[in-house]
């Protein structure tokens, strides 16, 4: 997240829209931070174009995009992947187990970065959420790739004049 911010601040004069970086801690115990944020900012929720979740940043594998049930975003992210110029996964999977969830429930388009193939190979959580989940397990290549790919996506989203991906209504979320 910090590397993405560092990258985008260098290009701030070329960004048409604002970006907000929010870090929530310990989502594993109940998404308290992200839920509280969404509840405390109902008017702001209506203005958000997109929420990118970095819960899986640092895991091995390619750093693609999981669109949480937003198939209309697929052409946009195909363009992002084409700009990046490498083979990246893009898939959709809706799950309530990370900080994107309260935003999704507010109708905001959300995505998480990662690699479904890596997750399948890992089989379970790996070291995650154990006493062995330490900084030496972080894949620095994956972190760099995640920051770079996220920067391309953010730059594209922040510079679109026409955002035709409207938020979902509560009936659509159902």
Give names to the regions the model predicted.
Residues 6, 10, 121-174:
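His/Asp/Glu-rich mid-to-C-terminal helical/loop segments that flank catalytic regions of hydrolases
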Residues 19, 41, 52, 71, ...:
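Solvent-exposed, flexible loop/coil residues
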Residues 1-31, 150:
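Alpha-helical metal-binding/catalytic segments enriched in His/Glu/Asp
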Residues 13, 22, 35, 63, ...:
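Flexible, active-site-adjacent loop/turn segments at secondary-structure boundaries
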């Amino acid at each position: 997240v910090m590397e993405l911010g560092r990258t985008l601040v260098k290009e701030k004069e070329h960004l048409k829209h604002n970006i907000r970086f929010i870090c929530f801690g310990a989502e594993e115990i109940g998404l308290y931070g992200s839920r509280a944020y969404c509840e405390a900012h109902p008017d702001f929720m209506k203005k958000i174009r997109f929420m990118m979740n970095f819960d899986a940043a640092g895991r091995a594998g390619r750093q693609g995009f999981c669109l949480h049930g937003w198939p209309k975003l697929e052409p946009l992210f195909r363009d992002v992947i084409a700009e990046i110029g490498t083979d990246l996964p893009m898939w959709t999977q809706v799950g309530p187990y990370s900080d994107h969830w309260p935003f999704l429930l507010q109708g905001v388009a959300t995505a998480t970065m990662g690699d479904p193939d890596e997750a399948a190979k890992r089989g379970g959580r790996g070291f995650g959420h154990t006493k062995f989940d330490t900084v030496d397990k972080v894949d620095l290549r994956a972190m760099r790739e995640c920051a770079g790919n996220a920067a391309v996506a953010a730059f594209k989203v922040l510079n679109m004049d026409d955002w035709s991906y409207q938020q979902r209504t509560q009936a659509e979320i159902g």
